[in-house]
């Protein structure tokens, strides 16, 4: 007899999809027994239950809505019936990704939350009606797309959290000296230098960040979930606030301790740069500590951090840099103080990560 074996990649892809909280439903024109046999081979859940195309024609939409909550196999189904299945899933609040390749699949592909057409054997009509076209017609590619999408979402969220956090101390140190009637800490060229660190950090460092180990073990987000939630905004704000408190303390202790204006400014600004770099390292992951995050390679991170430290050295120790930024050179002890203060400003969030992970597990 003839045999059309399942692709080797499909069972593992189905398992990974289940781990990511994605339900997999098989809609086929095959006979029920054939469909159930394939379902068992690929590891589909609940292969005992099925609905045939004839049954689908006989049951009402309300009954279909109830039965589709547990049935994952639809056999002897014609393309026109896919639209009913999509509508039943969507009426239950599901986000539906539908695959198809034929002309008659177009209505279901268009109605689904995400239409996925086959690029190899799919028709032009199916491709036009879809949101995504699979070049290799492989189910594994769909799971890989989910992984990439979650990584991009994570990295956007991290970049936005970092942007909010880093601008809190910048805004604070621009305003507070005016209120206290002390010399200005941040002059225009200081803010420009900070932005030269912030922009590549957001556009390059977080973009190049690898996905976290548990990215395909998380439940899917709902369509109502915000990219930048209140919880994320609150944590980011407190990251920035803690940096502001520490940097302001360094400035006030230095200035009222009798240091010159240029020395106080250099000390405060260097602390802010170290804290800024700390925020970049810290926001690479909200579940792994800084030291564990270093296990994940990101060459761009080291270019940005190295460049920032190099140019910080230039403006601290070369005469033209000192004149331009109104700095005086710092001693080795001063640098250690700035480094310690910068690390102290982000320490609480590292502790939060540890306790948060313990709570989750």
Residue ranges of model-derived segments:
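Cytosolic catalytic headpiece
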Residues: 1-104, 110-114, 156, 178, ...
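Membrane-embedded transport module
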Residues: 46-98, 112, 117-287
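Hydrophobic alpha-helical transmembrane segments in multi-pass integral membrane proteins
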Residues: 173, 246-248, 307-323
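Residue-level signature of transmembrane alpha-helical entry/exit and packing/kink sites
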Residues: 187, 235-236, 301, 334-338
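Alpha-helical transmembrane segments of multi-pass membrane proteins
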Residues: 194-198, 271-279, 308-315, 341-349
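Cytoplasmic-side transmembrane-helix entry/capping segments in multi-pass membrane proteins
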Residues: 292-301
């Amino acid at each position: 007899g003839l045999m059309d074996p399942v692709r080797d990649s499909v069972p593992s892809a189905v398992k990974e999809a289940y781990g990511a909280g994605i339900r997999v439903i098989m809609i086929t024109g095959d006979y029920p027994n054939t469909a159930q046999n394939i379902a068992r081979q690929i590891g589909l859940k609940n292969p005992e239950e099925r609905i045939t195309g004839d049954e689908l024609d006989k049951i009402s939409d309300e009954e279909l809505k109830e039965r589709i909550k547990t049935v994952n196999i639809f056999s002897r189904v014609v393309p026109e019936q896919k639209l009913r299945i999509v509508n039943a899933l969507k009426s239950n609040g599901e986000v539906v990704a539908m695959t198809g390749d034929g002309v008659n699949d177009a209505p279901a592909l268009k109605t689904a939350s995400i239409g996925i057409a086959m690029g190899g054997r799919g028709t032009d009509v199916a491709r036009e009606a879809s949101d995504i076209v699979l070049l290799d017609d492989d189910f594994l590619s769909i799971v890989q797309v989910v992984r990439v999408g979650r990584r991009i979402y994570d990295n956007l969220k991290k970049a936005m959290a970092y942007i909010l956090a880093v601008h809190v101390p910048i805004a604070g140190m621009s305003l507070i000296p005016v209120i206290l009637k002390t010399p200005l800490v941040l002059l225009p060229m200081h803010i420009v230098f900070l932005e030269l660190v912030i922009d590549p950090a957001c556009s390059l460092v977080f973009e190049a960040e690898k996905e976290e180990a548990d990215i395909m073990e998380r439940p899917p987000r709902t369509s109502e979930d915000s990219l930048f939630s209140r919880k994320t905004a609150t944590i980011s704000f407190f990251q920035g606030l803690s940096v502001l408190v520490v940097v302001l303390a360094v400035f006030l202790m230095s200035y009222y301790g009798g240091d010159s204006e240029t020395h106080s400014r250099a000390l405060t600004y260097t602390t802010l740069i170290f804290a800024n770099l700390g925020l970049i390292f810290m926001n690479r992951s909200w579940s792994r500590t800084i030291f564990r995050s270093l296990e994940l390679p990101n060459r761009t991170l080291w270019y940005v951090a190295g460049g920032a430290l190099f140019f910080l050295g230039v403006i601290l120790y070369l005469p033209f840099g000192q004149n331009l930024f109104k700095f005086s050179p710092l001693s080795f002890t001063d640098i250690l103080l700035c480094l310690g203060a910068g690390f102290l400003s982000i320490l609480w969030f590292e502790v939060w990560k540890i306790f948060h992970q313990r709570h989750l597990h």
